[in-house]
Design a protein with these regions (language model features):
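Conserved NAD(P)H cofactor-binding loop of Rossmann-fold oxidoreductase domains
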Residues: 19-21
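Surface-exposed alpha-helical segments enriched in charged/polar residues
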Residues: 10, 45-49, 184
Length: 269
């Protein structure tokens, strides 16, 4: 017989979910907050009910930082077991720089966007190298003026919206490839080292899902807070504050309880 809804993931150990409503032209990822987070709530509950042996879950549907957070909360899983797709923006930065400097994409290293997977993301360039040369030594020269770098950063943050404007729908090839690579790593393949959205709760960033400097492997997702220039860190802090506002809106919408009560739903948080 055909399987529908939650039956499709009974006893699954590895899950990729793109089950929310897609963005449409003129929409931001944040516009999807209420409806898709309600879907994420049910997804988390279904994972807890039907998938007792699940090892790892990758959430794709936007706003991914919040849908991933809600899924984690209601699934009862450990923070290391739920990640969100965040690498698209880093690969877009890599592609843009490769095109700018006329080199192969694999000659651009260290590209990363951190914080939220939205237009408030923090685009880091301080660790980037172009064919082995630090990007920081090129920015501000005649070859790559500061204004051009700032425009590229802005273009990266709006890359998803540009695709929708041109195609009339969201991208699916790159998200599919990267999410499968994430699951492959969780299953024991080569570690996934592009930034992933992960649950963060430390002295500076409290109870939020956001892209960090991560390593995803068979033991789960592990992160460290990225280092960068003062401007980059300030951009990351601003992205975190934006995510907190959306998280708090979920409390107002009664999709999640106050953060102080999360451990009652998921003791791992």
């Amino acid at each position: 017989r055909s399987l529908v809804g939650s039956e499709m993931c009974i006893r699954d150990r590895y899950i990729i979910s793109s089950g929310g409503a897609p963005r449409k032209a003129g929409m931001t990822r944040e516009d999807l907050l209420k409806g898709n987070c309600e879907i994420a709530e049910q997804l988390g509950k279904d994972i807890k009910t039907y998938c007792p042996d699940v090892k790892h879950v990758v959430i794709i549907f936007n706003p991914a930082d919040l849908t991933g957070l809600v899924t984690l909360l209601y699934s009862g899983l450990k923070p290391s077991q739920v990640t969100t797709l965040a690498a698209l923006d880093s690969t877009r930065l890599q592609s843009a720089l490769a095109k700018k400097f006329g080199v192969m994409q694999n000659q651009i290293t260290g590209c990363a966007t951190y914080g939220g997977h939205g237009e408030q993301m923090a685009v880091f360039g301080s660790a980037v190298k172009v064919a082995g040369k630090p990007l920081s030594e090129i920015i501000g020269t005649a070859e790559f003026p500061v204004e051009e770098w700032k425009q590229m950063q802005q273009d990266v943050t709006k890359g998803g919206a540009k695709i929708i404007e041109l195609r009339g729908r969201s991208s699916f090839q790159s998200p599919s490839y990267l999410s499968v690579e994430m699951i492959r790593s969780a299953m024991g393949g080569e570690a996934f080292r592009w930034p992933a959205g992960t649950f963060v709760n430390n002295e500076k960033y409290k109870c939020i899902m956001m892209a960090m400097k991560t390593t995803l492997d068979a033991t789960g997702c592990h992160f460290e807070v990225p280092t960068g220039t003062a401007d980059e860190v300030a951009s990351l802090d601003a992205s975190y504050e934006h995510l907190c506002k959306m998280r708090d809106e979920l409390v107002t919408l009664n999709i999640v309880p106050p953060v102080s009560e999360w451990s009652k739903i998921n003791p791992n948080l």
